[in-house]
Every structure is written in C-alpha cells, then in structure tokens.
Amino acid sequence: MNLSTFIKKARRWFYDTPDRALEQAYRAALNIQAIELEHFGGKPVSGHNADYSDSVIRYFQGEVRKQLKIIEVRLREFRSFNTVVPVSEETIQKKASNIYYPDAADKPTLIIEKLRFIDEITGRYGRGLSKQSVALVPLNGPEAPQTNGDRPDNKPKVETVSDKTGLVPRSIMRTFSRIQREIDPKSNEAEAEVVTKFRRSRNKTAVSIRFLLTLVIVPLLVHQLAKIAITPFVEEHFFTEASPALFVNSDLENEAFEELEHYRATLEMRQLVGLAPALTEVEITEKIQEKATEIAQDYRAESYNAYENIFSDIFSFFAFVGILLISKREIAMLKGFLDEIVYGLSDSAKAFLIILFTDIFVGYHSPHGWEIILENVAKHFGIAESRDFNFLFIATFPVILDTVLKYWIFRYLNRISPSAVATYRNMNE
C-alpha cells in the first residue's frame, strides 16, 4: 500500500465518521427494540412488563444499559464530527469510492428518521441520555405512565422531530418502505445482496458437512489400513509360535478357563442323560484337547486385535489432529454452521436437548451406561477391567460434567438465550 492510497483511506474514514457514528447508535437502538419486542411485548424493559425472575430482569437491564451507553457515546461523536466535516469534501470522498451512499437530497431524511427512532427508544428510559437514562428507570411504567411530553422540565418546551406524531404509525410506514425497496425493479443491489448471502450460506453448509464427513471417515479409514499393515508386525514380535503368551490380561484368561470348564461339564452332562454315547477317558481327553486348542486360537486372535487397536488408534489420532491443524478455515465455518443450528432452535427445543443430554450422561441411570462404556474401552485395548477404577470414574466424571454444563448454562446460555434457560428450568421441575 503506497502513501497516497493510505492517505485517501484515512481521509475517507475521517469524513465517514458522522455517518458511521449515527449508524452505530441506530443499531444500538434497534437492539433495544428487539429486546422489548421479543421479551417484553414491545414495552420498556421492566419487571412490571414481564414474568421473568429478578436475575433475568437484571440481565436485560444490563443489556439495555450497554446499548444506551453506546448510543450516548456515538451520538456525541456524531454531533462533534458533524460540525467539522465539510460537506463538499465528504461528497467528494464518497463519490471517489465504490461504496453506495444515498443521494444528498435523501440523506437529511434518513438522518432525521434515524434520530427520531433513537429519540423514541431512549425517551422511554429517562431524559435523553442523562444519568437517569443509564439508571434504566422506565418512564412509562404501569403505575405512573408518562410520555415524552409529560416529563417535568423547567426549560421551555421545544417540539422536536421525535415528538411529532403522524396519522399513520411509523412502524407501518417503515414496513411499506421496506416492501417498496424489495419490489422496486431498480433495486438490483438488494437482489444481488440476497443472492450473495444465499450462496455464502450454501457454501458454508456444504463445506461444514464435507468437513464433518472427513473428520469421521478419514480416521476410520486410517484405522483399518493401519490394522492391516500392523498385523504381520504384531504376529512377528508379540505372538510367535514359540511364545507361551496366549492372553494379554487375566480377564481373557479367566474367560477361556470358564469356557473350557463349561465344555467339559456339558460333555459329561450329555453322557449322563443319554444324549451322547459313552466315551472312554482317552476320548474325553482328546475332545477336551481339541476344544482347548480352538479356544486358544480364538483368544490369541483377540489378543492380536488388542495390540493392533493400540497402534491403529495412535495413527487415527494423528490423522484426526492433522486434519484439524490444516483445516482452520473449515473449523471456523463449521463453528458458524453449528451455531446457526443450535441457536436457531426454539427455546423448547434447546431445553429438550439439554435435558436429554443431562439425563443420558449425568442422570440417575447414567452410571450403568458409563460402566458399559468403560468395559468396552478396556476390552478394546486389551486392558484388565478394574472395578475400583470404574467406580471412581463414575463417581467423579459425571459430577464434573454436570458442573461444567451448569456453568455453561449460567455463564453463556443465560446471556444468549435467557428464555431458553427459563424454559429449561420449568421443564426440569
């Protein structure tokens, strides 16, 4: 970037400061309106206008305070810069860029509309943006309803643009304006923006699903290929013909002994009840020897599998980590895709999924599931099962998981979707 380009961008940023400050204040007012419409029926944020707990009301009040502070700072910035930025220079800089800006004739109308909307929102929480406004005391509560014109003021009453009320509500006019922009045949920019957003969303969905499949398929494929390649190595170094080792742990050995004893008892039982012809001691010994050889081969193969699983899982883990290291862009897109799915669910769906997750992993019947998981993991790696370790794990890990989940609900979900938390508590009770 050369010096002239840098100077042009700096000048453009300076001349755009009033519009940028007003836009940020306008968006903060829109955020306050969204909270009022979604959670308080379009009324000011107050405990009188909703059936939320004190903690939820305090959360919403804190959010409104933050937005009011943004409005206060940005409007001060707008007033300061709007008096010093030359209009001619501002117009020149905007025309020099490729960014769309409203015509000079339309700009005052847009500014007045935004200031009117900001006055309408902030007027509900005190005079202008004074300390009383930040204290968040709604003026139109149920006990003493007031409007902008009812506020006590020692100064002469001056009618502002926001105090004027037309015959038609402004929200209806804004709706008609939006519809007009959407059906306007000249609004190619809006149509192009919609198409661009759709293509971006479609691309993000395709990349996310493809990345998820890669995370699952590639490690599994590496596991199977590694197991095939490792089998000769395991047979050569761990289980030779001269090696007396048949079992990798005592559990497999006990299972083999129980199976052999069961075969011996079955053989004797069939002879005693007449289901099989009587056999001599030599014949019985030969049959038991054949069964013992068969059992030894089966458990030797199971021991093979345990060693192969250890090495194959190591290769699969490295493959999984390698995919994550080289796919930072895909990870970011997957995170956004999952956020859209999770936070796009209704409050009841969120509460249902949370209750389902907690009941499965930390609920009353979860110890039985954890015990089965630990048994299969130990069998997968050829490790002797330890009842003491299983009980210790079941007594600690679900508790830690439950604590983490409750902290997540309190710290994050309560801030992002407090209504989902309220629904979760009602469903859980």
Curated annotation (Swiss-Prot):
Organism, scientific name: Picosynechococcus sp. (strain ATCC 27264 / PCC 7002 / PR-6) (Agmenellum quadruplicatum)
GO cellular component: plasma membrane
Entry membrane topology: Multi-pass membrane protein
InterPro entries reported in the protein's UniProt record: CemA
Sorted UniProt keywords: Cell inner membrane, Cell membrane, Hydrogen ion transport, Ion transport, Membrane, Transmembrane, Transmembrane helix, Transport
Function field: Required for H(+) efflux immediately after light irradiation to form a rapid H(+) concentration gradient across the thylakoid membranes. Together with PxcL, contributes to transient H(+) uptake following dark to light transition.
Name of the protein in question: Proton extrusion protein PxcA
Predominant location: membrane
Spans annotated as Disordered: 139-161
Keyword Transmembrane recorded: yes
Xref: HAMAP family: CemA_PxcA (MF_01308)
Example of a GO MF term: proton transmembrane transporter activity
Pfam families xrefs: CemA (PF03040)
Recorded superkingdom: Bacteria
Positions with biased composition (Basic and acidic residues): 150-161
Subcellular location: Cell inner membrane
Entry's family note: Belongs to the CemA family.
Transmembrane segments: 211-231, 306-326, 353-373, 389-409
